[in-house]
Design a protein with these regions (language model features):
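Anion-binding alpha/beta catalytic cores of soluble intermediary-metabolism enzymes, centered on
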Residues: 1-332
Length: 332
């Protein structure tokens, strides 16, 4: 999977911002990326500290651009742009204070077109990586929420699972008068479509199963109606994808069960992209696949943003940073 992405990136190297340029894991991954020559890293941090940490670790980052928010020549322009984007919610002073931090500064570099993608979270929390993205980069046209998926790899086998990390549950959004502005089913449908699109980037021809404890109306209650209604909406949103549900996991992956429980479905028995009705199921599901099924898990990969921005685990190692950088750039 990674070799194919690297070959694509070599033809069109992308700029990727690392918000924690001082971190040894980021520096080790950066050195590997520089050696590979298929990405252009930009490190955020104090120049002297970043260089000292690289030298201490023996990481060659010669030629890599290092930007310090506290000495950045274009800060006034960046502050003005952020004030405009926040639409009166933050004063110039508040914006400047936020931009002194790598997470906001790096996100604005992407928003202003200086780089195409961003990877953070080695020391920042998920909230501190996602919040600036939502406030500044925002969601892409036609998408209402950010979600996530994992690409799971076992040998030559690849599957996608979403949402396993961002949306806790799906509830109707209502305005002050109590009118539904975005239904729970619409939200889950968007997760399905965005996960299918992500899967396609990684060479998966998506066959999307909307998972439940019920198959094609066999059960009632819980999130059955949510998954059923979301299936219909997702089909309308993206008729180019095979999407079906609701269905149980065995009906999704076992051809004989799929044929028995959901006859006529193009997805049942052949699914490779799995949409969970809540974060509990999603998080448990991908970890079962990882720990008992022998799949390698890559993610969470954020979806729905107007530019590729991804969040690392604070327990990540340099190899995980390296691979997530490739994944993030591949989404441009």
């Amino acid at each position: 999977m990674f070799n194919a992405m690297i070959e694509t990136l070599k033809a069109n190297p992308r700029k990727i911002v690392f918000t924690e340029g001082h971190d040894a894991r980021i520096l080790e991954a950066t050195a590997r990326l520089v050696e590979g020559g298929f990405l252009t890293p930009i490190l955020i941090g104090n120049v002297d500290e970043v260089k000292a940490n690289a030298a201490k670790g023996g990481f060659n980052i010669e030629g890599v651009e290092i930007l310090d928010p506290l000495t950045y020549a274009g800060m006034d322009e960046m502050v003005a742009k952020m004030v405009e984007l926040r639409k009166g919610k933050m004063s110039p002073e508040e914006c400047k204070a936020a931009l002194s931090k790598g997470n906001y500064f790096g996100t604005m570099l992407v928003k202003m077109g200086y780089a195409e993608s961003l990877l953070g979270g080695a020391t920042y929390s998920t909230a501190d990586t996602v919040r600036p993205a939502l406030q500044l980069v925002k969601t892409k046209k036609g998408v209402n929420l950010v979600s996530s998926c994992f690409i799971m790899v076992r040998g030559d086998e690849k599957i996608a699972m979403g949402d396993c990390a961002i949306n806790l549950s799906y509830e109707d959004s209502v305005d002050k008068e109590g009118n539904v502005t975005l239904s729970a089913a619409q939200k889950l449908a968007e997760v399905a479509v965005e996960t299918a699109r992500t899967a396609k980037v990684f060479g998966i021809d998506p066959k999307v199963a909307m998972l439940s404890f019920s198959t094609n109306g066999s059960g009632k209650g819980g999130t059955v109606k949510l998954s059923h209604d979301a299936t219909a909406i997702a089909k309308e949103l993206a008729p180019e994808f095979d999407i079906d549900g609701e269905m149980q996991f065995d009906a999704a992956v076992a051809p004989e069960v799929g044929q028995l429980k959901f006859p006529g479905s193009k997805v049942a028995g052949h699914a490779n992209t799995f949409i969970f009705p809540c974060i509990e199921a999603g998080n448990i599901g991908y970890k079962i696949a990882q720990r008992l099924g022998g799949f390698e898990a890559y993610g969470p990969i954020l979806q729905g943003l107007a530019a590729p921005i991804n969040d690392l685990s604070r327990g990540c190692n340099a190899d995980e940073v390296y691979k997530m950088a490739i994944i993030t750039a591949a989404l441009v």
